[in-house]
């Protein structure tokens, strides 16, 4: 579903372009395959689905519970796509494109293996210190504009695989940490509006935080994701409130702020009530 929304957003905002869309996964249900076919037919674009054998990736670490080793597939994509193209744009499945994608694909890579956006300054400071990166730079690998020949020349896939079996305590994340250790800042850095949050002017939204728009709508970017879901072949979703548990008190603060901006006073007061109650419960140690 998430992939379908990402692709729908790209195609809706780039109707003048022809695409070859390559989808890499470790498995796919019949329902999702049927929906993908519907997506291809609706937009008259070419789709290719790769169901990957994950055995070669089993020695890579899994750092967080909601991740899987599928994140490491991006490290072998250049070898698979090499007979088909010189360059390609890699995107995570938790993204939205809200404008002209050629803003990215027209970028001159200047001899670098790929272009990517930096993490936030706070994340860069933490990550570069944790990973002992000499460059002081750290990119997000959720979107990469890749030159396959340069990637191959620098043997990036092979260098990534050299980290198989490494002590997981060396890393705070997964493929992104390894990619940054391999490149250590030697890429073309592009504006964060091409891999960003909800700032004005963002071209590519990236929902890489703990709150996901397919779980709940907490801001305008989440609502935009639901809009593209409605345009896709996948079923629309209800918009439930966050659970009324102390751990979710801050989500009610976000809802309160959004309601205030939209001048929905009744909703604002409702969310203020639950924000206050749940925050008190959290301080009292109630579950």
Language-model-detected regions and their locations in the chain:
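Histidine-anchored nucleotide/phosphate-binding helix
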Residues: 1-14
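Short alpha-helix within the catalytic core of nucleotide-sugar-dependent glycosyltransferases
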Residues: 8, 34-37, 83, 98-109, ...
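Active-site-proximal specificity loops/subdomain of glycosyltransferases
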Residues: 31-80
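Catalytic metal- and UDP-sugar-binding loop of GT-A-like glycosyltransferases, i.e.
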Residues: 91
């Amino acid at each position: 579903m998430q992939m379908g929304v990402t692709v729908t957003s790209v195609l809706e905002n780039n109707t003048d372009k022809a695409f070859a869309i390559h989808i890499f996964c470790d498995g796919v249900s019949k329902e999702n395959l049927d929906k993908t076919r519907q997506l291809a037919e609706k937009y008259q674009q070419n789709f290719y689905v790769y169901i990957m054998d994950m055995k070669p990736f089993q020695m890579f670490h899994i750092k967080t519970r909601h991740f899987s080793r599928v994140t490491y597939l991006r490290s072998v994509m250049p070898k698979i796509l090499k007979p088909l193209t010189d360059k390609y744009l890699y995107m995570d499945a938790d993204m939205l494109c809200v404008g002209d994608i050629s803003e990215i694909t027209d970028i001159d890579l200047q001899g670098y293996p790929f272009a990517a956006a930096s993490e936030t300054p706070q994340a860069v400071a933490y990550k570069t210190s944790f990973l002992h990166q000499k460059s002081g730079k750290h990119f997000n690998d959720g979107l990469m504009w890749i030159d396959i020949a340069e990637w191959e020349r620098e043997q990036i896939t092979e260098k990534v695989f050299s980290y198989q079996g490494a002590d997981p305590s060396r890393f705070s994340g997964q493929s992104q940490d390894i990619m940054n250790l391999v490149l250590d800042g030697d890429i073309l850095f592009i504006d964060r509006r091409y891999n960003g949050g909800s700032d004005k002017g963002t071209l590519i939204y990236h929902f890489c935080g703990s709150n996901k728009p397919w779980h709940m709508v907490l801001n305008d970017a989440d609502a935009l994701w639901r809009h593209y879901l409605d345009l896709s072949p996948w079923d629309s979703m209800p918009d439930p409130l966050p659970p009324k548990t102390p751990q979710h008190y801050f989500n009610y603060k976000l809802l309160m702020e959004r309601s205030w901006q939209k001048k929905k006073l009744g909703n604002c007061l409702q969310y203020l009530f639950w924000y206050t109650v749940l925050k008190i419960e959290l301080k009292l140690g109630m579950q």
